Regions:
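Flexible, low-complexity linker/hinge segments
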Residues: 1-9, 125, 145-178
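Structural core segment of the AMP-binding/adenylate-forming
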Residues: 14-16, 58, 85-159, 483-484, ...
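Conserved AMP-binding/adenylate-forming core of the ANL superfamily
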Residues: 27-73, 77-81, 98-103, 156-159
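Conserved adenylate-forming
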Residues: 55-60, 164-177, 181-223, 235, ...
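AMP-binding/adenylate-forming catalytic core of the ANL superfamily
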Residues: 97, 103, 114-116, 271, ...
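Conserved AMP-binding/adenylation subdomain of ANL enzymes
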Residues: 202-221, 229-269, 284
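Gly/Ser/Thr-rich phosphate-binding loop
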Residues: 242, 268-273, 282-353, 366, ...
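Conserved beta-loop-beta connector loops within the AMP-binding
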Residues: 361-388, 422-423, 484-488, 523
Length: 537
C-alpha cells in the first residue's frame, strides 16, 4: 500500500476548482433570441449548486437519470455540473433523433425530470403521453419567457432553481458512481446507452487536457460547435473548467454569419465540430471574402476530414486542422492527430496527407487491429482489419444490458476497419458496414470520398457499395455539386491518379443533398436502399 492520500474523483470538485481559481473566465453563449449572453465559471458554479440543491429538495436520488434536450448555452453548463454534482446522472438527449427514438430513450432511462429548450416544447407535447416516467418538464427560460404549452407539470428553469442554495456542498460520491448517460444514434435498432462514471470522466478530462490530447493553452477561446448532447460535448465542458478556458457556445446559431460573428467578437482561437459544419463555414467565408484571423486551430471529428478541407483551412485561413477520433463508447476522445515539429518541416502536400489520418492514441487508450479470426495484424500501415480498443474511459457494457460488450481481455470492437502505421498513426479505412467488398477485395469508401471531394465542382461526396452481377458489390459515387457543372468525365479524370484503377466508381450520380443523421453523419443506409439496384437494372 502507498502512503498517498485517498481522493475521490467527483465532477463537483471540478466546478469548485474552476470557481476558486478561474471565477472570472467567461462562458459566452447565444440565446434563442440571438442575444449574446455572458456568464463565467464563478456564476455557473453558484447556479449549478442552486440547481443541485433544488434537485435534492425535489427528491431526485443518487444514480437517477435526469434528461435534457438542450442547446449549447450557459444553462446547459449549469446542468452538467448541478445534476452530476448532486449525485444524479446527466442524461443528454439528441433532439435530432426521430421522435419515436426520443420517447424510447426517455422511457429506457426512466427520466423523472426533463429539462428542455422552449423550442422543443412542441416535440415533447406530442410525446408526453408516451413517456409515463416523466413527472415534470423544466423549460430553460425565466418565468417571463414561458411560452404557452400543453406540457403537463411544467415550470421555468429560473423558478425551479430560485430557492436553491448557492452555497450547497456537493455530496461525497463513489468515484465509480455514474455521472453521465449518452445513447448511440441508433441507425440500426434502438439506441444503446453508455453510462459514464465520475472517475472515467475525470480521467478523460485529464487526458484531453494533455499536449497530446487537444493541445490546449490556458489563454484559448474555444468555439464549441459540437452539440453538448453529443458524447458529453466531447468532454469540453469539463476540459474547459479544469484549465480555465473560455468557452463560446453558439446556441442555435450554426450558420456562417452567426459563427463568424462569435469568432470575431470573442476572439476564438480554437473551434470544435464536425465536417458538415465547417464545410458551410468555409463556403460562407469564401463567398464573402472573410478570413478567420483569430482562429489558429480546429479539431474535427464525427467523420473523416477530406484532404481538400485540411488544405483550404490552411491556405485560406492559416488554420491548422487536428483530426480526432472517438465514439459514444469511448467518451469520446481516443486518438488525436496533433501537429508535430516533424510535420511542420514536411512539404505541405505531404503534411496534409498525414493530417488525413485519425492520429495516435492518447495516454490511457490502447488500440489494435485484428482479422476475422481474431489474429492481431501488424502495424505496418498496409494491413487493415477490425479496430479494437480498451482503456479506463471505454465502454464495458451498455446500459441495462445483461452481458459485456468486450471480449475476455477487455477489448471493445469499434465497428471500424482501420490500419495503424509504424509511427502509431491510426487511419479509419471505413465503417465495417460501409466498406465495399468487390470481388473479394475491400474498397474504402472514405478514401474515395476524400479524393472526390478535392474536385472544384464537388461540394460533398458519398460513396456506397451497390449490388453487381459479377463483382458482388461495386462503388457508386454520389455528388452534391458545388455549382451548375455536372461533368462526370471531369470527375473520373480527376480521380485517375488518386485511386487504384479498380477502385474507379462504376457510376457518378448527382443529387441535391445527402441525408444527414442526428449526429451529423451521412445516412448511408438510406442511400444504399435507394440505389441498391442501380447497376443491375
Amino acid at each position: 500500500m502507498s502512503n498517498m492520500q485517498a481522493w475521490k474523483q467527483n465532477i463537483g470538485s471540478l466546478i469548485d476548482y474552476a470557481e476558486r481559481i478561474f471565477p472570472e473566465v467567461e462562458i459566452v453563449s447565444r440565446a434563442l433570441t440571438g442575444e449574446i449572453v455572458k456568464s463565467n465559471y464563478g456564476q455557473v458554479a453558484k447556479r449549478a449548486k442552486k440547481l443541485g440543491s433544488s434537485l435534492e429538495s425535489y427528491g431526485i436520488q443518487h444514480g437517477q437519470n435526469v434528461g435534457s434536450l438542450a442547446l449549447n448555452t450557459y444553462r446547459n453548463m449549469e446542468m452538467y455540473y448541478g445534476i452530476s454534482g448532486m449525485g444524479a446522472v446527466m442524461h443528454t438527449i439528441n433532439f435530432r433523433l426521430h421522435p419515436e427514438q426520443i420517447a424510447y430513450i426517455i422511457n429506457h432511462a426512466e427520466n423523472r425530470l426533463i429539462f428542455l429548450e422552449t423550442v422543443f416544447a412542441p416535440l415533447l407535447e406530442a410525446l408526453q403521453d408516451n413517456c409515463p416516467t416523466v413527472e415534470k418538464y423544466i423549460l430553460l427560460c425565466s418565468k417571463e419567457e414561458m411560452p404557452e404549452t400543453k406540457l403537463k407539470n411544467v415550470i421555468s428553469y429560473e423558478e425551479f432553481i430560485e430557492d436553491g442554495d448557492e452555497s450547497y456542498s456537493w455530496p461525497e460520491l463513489d468515484e465509480d458512481a455514474p455521472c453521465g448517460l449518452c445513447y448511440t444514434s441508433g441507425t440500426t435498432g434502438n439506441p444503446k446507452g453508455v453510462l459514464y462514471s465520475h472517475k472515467s470522466t475525470l480521467l478523460h478530462t485529464w487526458a484531453g487536457s494533455s499536449a497530446n490530447g487537444l493541445g490546449l493553452d490556458k489563454d484559448d477561446s474555444i468555439l464549441m460547435v459540437v452539440p453538448m448532447f453529443h458524447v458529453m460535448g466531447w468532454g469540453l465542458p469539463y476540459i474547459g473548467a479544469m484549465n480555465g478556458i473560455k468557452l463560446v457556445l453558439p446556441g442555435m446559431g450554426m450558420d456562417g454569419p452567426a459563427l463568424v460573428e462569435l469568432i470575431e467578437k470573442e476572439h476564438v482561437t480554437l473551434a470544435f465540430g464536425v465536417p458538415t459544419i465547417w464545410l458551410g463555414l468555409l463556403n460562407y467565408c469564401k463567398e464573402n471574402n472573410i478570413k478567420l484571423n483569430t482562429v489558429k486551430q480546429t479539431l474535427i471529428g464525427g467523420s473523416a476530414v477530406p484532404y481538400s478541407m485540411i488544405k483550404q483551412f490552411d491556405e485560406e485561413h492559416n488554420i491548422n486542422v487536428v483530426q480526432g477520433w472517438g465514439m459514444t463508447e469511448t467518451s469520446p476522445l481516443a486518438t488525436a492527430n496533433i501537429k508535430t515539429k516533424a510535420m511542420e518541416k514536411m512539404p505541405k502536400d505531404e503534411m496534409y496527407k498525414l493530417q488525413t489520418k485519425q492520429g495516435k492514441p492518447i495516454y490511457g487508450v490502447e488500440l489494435k487491429i485484428i482479422d476475422d479470426d481474431g489474429k492481431t495484424l501488424p502495424e505496418d500501415g498496409k494491413a487493415y482489419g477490425k479496430l479494437m480498443i480498451r482503456g479506463p474511459w471505454i465502454n464495458k457494457r451498455y446500459y441495462k444490458h445483461d452481458s459485456d460488450a468486450v471480449d475476455a481481455d477487455g477489448w471493445f470492437d469499434t465497428g471500424d476497419i482501420s490500419s495503424i502505421d509504424p509511427d502509431g498513426y491510426m487511419t479509419i479505412v471505413d465503417r465495417a458496414k460501409d466498406v465495399i467488398k468487390s470481388g473479394g477485395e475491400w474498397i474504402s469508401s472514405v478514401d474515395l470520398e476524400n479524393a472526390a471531394q478535392g474536385h472544384p465542382d464537388v461540394m460533398q461526396a458519398c460513396v456506397i457499395g451497390v449490388a453487381h452481377p459479377k463483382w458482388d458489390e461495386r462503388p457508386v459515387l454520389l455528388v452534391v455539386p458545388a455549382n451548375e457543372k455536372k461533368d462526370k468525365d471531369s470527375i473520373f479524370t480527376f480521380l485517375e491518379d488518386k485511386i487504384a484503377k479498380w477502385w474507379k466508381p462504376d457510376d457518378i450520380i448527382f443529387i441535391e443533398e445527402l441525408p444527414i443523421g442526428a449526429t451529423g453523419k451521412v445516412l448511408k443506409v438510406k442511400l444504399r436502399e435507394q440505389f441498391k439496384d442501380h447497376l443491375i437494372k
